[in-house]
Amino acid sequence: MVKAVVVLSSSEGVSGTVQFTQEGSGPTTVTGNVSGLRPGLHGFHVHALGDTTNGCMSTGPHFNPAGKEHGAPEDETRHAGDLGNITVGDDGTATFTIIDSQIPLTGPNSIVGRAVVVHADPDDLGRGGHELSKATGNAGGRVACGVIGLQG
């Protein structure tokens, strides 16, 4: 089993930890707990770069090795990094589990060394009709991020 972790941070008081586990060539299980967000849905994506020198802005676009349009996690046409939304409760906390087959922890399309980004707004899953829907899900600003690192 391969394990990875990201510690999310921000200048806006958002924090959290996200764990990734993958058994063999099976899907990757993502479990997380994020706090300090406003209640509601927030876009949750793997971005292409693990560069946080300019905060979350330098993490690049969504991880998209196949060159597809943005979509929902269950869509055939989607960026590999499109993990949809996390749901934040009235207490400002989101606890979630996602199982996804397009974010491996090993191999040429590994997400290790890339960044996880939590966005300010809901991801419209490419269906919102906004000019940014097919690129970013119109999920708004980047409120927290961190680099995915291997765990022992």
From Swiss-Prot:
PROSITE patterns: SOD_CU_ZN_1, SOD_CU_ZN_2. Cu cation binds at H45, H47, H62, H119. It is an enzyme of class 1 (oxidoreductase). One of its GO terms (molecular function) is superoxide dismutase activity. It catalyses: 2 superoxide + 2 H(+) = H2O2 + O2. SUPFAM superfamilies: Cu,Zn superoxide dismutase-like. Zn(2+) binds at H62, H70, H79, D82. CDD domains: Cu-Zn_Superoxide_Dismutase (cd00305). InterPro entries: SOD-like_Cu/Zn_dom_sf, SOD_Cu/Zn_/chaperone, SOD_Cu/Zn_BS, SOD_Cu_Zn_dom. It is found in: Cytoplasm. Its EC number is 1.15.1.1. Its cofactor is Cu cation; Zn(2+). Pfam families: Sod_Cu. GO terms for cellular component: cytoplasm. Belongs to the Cu-Zn superoxide dismutase family. PANTHER family: SUPEROXIDE DISMUTASE CU-ZN -RELATED (PTHR10003). Homodimer. This is Superoxide dismutase [Cu-Zn] 1. It comes from Mesembryanthemum crystallinum (Common ice plant).
